[in-house]
Amino acid sequence: KMQLGDWVALDAEPGSYFGATPTALTSQAYYALSAQLLALAAEVLGNRQDAELYAGVHRQAAQDFAANFFTLDGAMTAQTQTAHILALRFGLTPQKWKQKTIQRLLELLEQQNGHLVTGFLGTPYFCAALSQNGCWQQAYDLMLKKDYPGWLYQVLQGATTVWEHWDGRRPDGTMWSAGMNSFNH
């Protein structure tokens, strides 16, 4: 079965649309999130039986995520920004490894000079994962980066909407791909 994973992440192999975060990890993370949201919706709707059912599915999915994507010493098996973002933002990081996961995300961010290299699955949650874990300054700095890759880089290039690719138009004027390069996402 094909999964798009962290689509158009900058940590992809050259010429690939698929980011470096394993699709098994992104699929499991979003499965857990979906179960959690279903449990919350059922609770709001007053359907206690479904709320309990989906809360149980979420608990099991979170346990499976930890077993599959954390080593015995608490390191994530995938050393990507997206892996750490999803684990933190979706509440899938075991408490005993939370600080280690936060620290590693900050290291991965620093390795990119404070820039993101995430795709469609990691990007929407990056600033929230940072700020919810006390990293307000890093979230603020990330959001306001004016150079490539970053949101304000796109704005300074004349963008009025978010581009499909971070490198839709590179600083040297070249494009990632003329065949698939939407400037309206």
Residue ranges and their predicted role:
Residues 1-185:
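Active-site core of glycosidic bond-cleaving carbohydrate-active enzymes
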